[in-house]
Amino acid sequence: VFDGDGDLLGVGQFYTGRRAMVQWQTGGFKLAFIEPTTIDDDATRVYDLIIPKIEANYAFKGDSWFLDAYGGFQYYSIDYFQGNDPDVTAWVVGLGGGMNFGAFYVNLGGHYAANAGAYGAYGSALGGLTPINDDFSIDANQDVNDNSGWGALAVLGWNMNDKWTIEGGVGYEYAELDVDGPAGDGESVWQVYLNTTVNIAPGFFIVPEIGYASYDYAAVTVAGQDEAKPNIFYAGAKWQINF
């Protein structure tokens, strides 16, 4: 629940938020054409959006298990008023699933991405720390330096009874810029948590949680941080009423 019901978003769980789209579905298959993610134009450049972001997903389901396979692709060019006009390609492929074993359940997931930041991936800023750098860069010749990365997560839970559920999880995210020197050393973040959902009444529950997160930055990109490998420990709880 930390970080606004973070759910390991940006730390093993790939997430891009909600954007305008046109979606088609048949059975367990979904195909979507989505508004691309870019930053604003400025005095030196404009973005030439040629095609929409394209995403596809297929969901497999059984009585006690599920499996989701997904992928996405985004492409645009940067038109500099002076100099080159580089193309930016970003994509992701991933797999996630889960299974119930009586009162226990386990969820696993993983993904690999190129230029995830340009794609619009959510960057985790736990405790106000700076998200790891998962975006491309432009060099002095106005060429694109790509960024590649991956993430994974695992969650294990136990439904003790109708009132109590115990859950623990761990997530990891890594990204590396394709440049020489310290800036290409790669950055990572991992998080582990343990919580308990307590059902007080129908629609009313409380979730106490403890957790730990650790960041590892390439030193040259640590803007506003006191150290290259900060970490945080947190403890708290939330309550929620569903009407």
Model features per residue range: what roles?
Residues 7-9, 29-37, 67-75, 165-175, ...:
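Transmembrane beta-strand segments that form the barrel wall of outer-membrane beta-barrel proteins
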Residues 16-20, 25-27, 48-54, 87-93, ...:
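Residues that define the transmembrane beta-barrel architecture of outer-membrane proteins
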Residues 38-51, 55-57, 170-195, 218, ...:
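C-terminal/domain-terminus segments
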Residues 61-190:
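Detector for outer-membrane/organellar transmembrane beta-barrel domains
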Residues 198-200, 204, 229-243:
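Outer-membrane beta-barrel "beta-signal"
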Residues 192-211, 215-217:
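C-terminal closing repeat unit and adjoining cap/tail of repeat-based domains
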